[in-house]
Amino acid sequence: MSVVTHIYPAYINGVLTKANSWTADTVNCALFSASTFTNTDTTYTTSGTEVASANGYTTGGGAVGTRTISSQTTTPQLCKITGAFGGGAAGTTTWTATGAGFTAVAAKLYVVSGVPICNVDFGGSQTASGGGTFTITWDATNGVFNAASS
């Protein structure tokens, strides 16, 4: 299973027009039962295929914590998550499953004020059983996503 990340054009536009900031905005991570990336999405919504509020997951997900950008002289610019959500290690987003647990095939990062950032397709179903954890470990080397110019 390969993980594929798609960045929403609305977020790129927001960064270029200074309406959004990877390091300053409050960013959440939500889990989905289907990968639903659409280039035309301009607003994050909890409707559709987001994992339901139950068994240790809450609709809307949770804040991912601290984010960084590599040095402006580095190519590509690496956008990383270095904080933690859910009591996990730095650079992770974690939920503790209860009851029957839950399953997700994708995660979406979004600015809490409404702009979707990216869709992370896990390449298949990932399940956390009751008492287990569902952990996303963000790539500490290459970042969640990057931007490069030539």
Feature roles, as predicted:
Residues 1-105, 112-150:
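Small cysteine-rich, disulfide-bonded extracellular modules of the LU/uPAR three-finger superfamily
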